[in-house]
Amino acid sequence: AHMDCTEFNPLCRCNKMLGDLICAVIGDAKEEHRNMCALCCEHPGGFEYSNGPCE
């Protein structure tokens, strides 16, 4: 099943780091900034963002 993601946050982007998919402020992967972003959800077309759980 693909991830149904909503609530796009333009300040954040999905990044692959250390094998993990995280959502971080663009240009910044600091730990304290990751939680400021929505969840990073993967789906067949790429990545989107969700303020709720990836489904």
Curated annotation (Swiss-Prot):
SUPFAM superfamilies: Kazal-type serine protease inhibitors
This protein's record includes keyword Secreted: yes
A GO molecular-function annotation: serine-type endopeptidase inhibitor activity
Entries under Gene3D superfamilies matching the protein: 3.30.60.30
Residues annotated as domain Kazal-like: 1-55
Site for Reactive bond, residues: 16-17
Top-level taxon in the UniProt lineage: Eukaryota
Segment forming the signal sequence: none
Chain's role: Potent inhibitor of trypsin.
Name of the protein this chain belongs to: Trypsin inhibitor
Lineage of the species this protein comes from: Eukaryota, Metazoa, Chordata, Tunicata, Ascidiacea
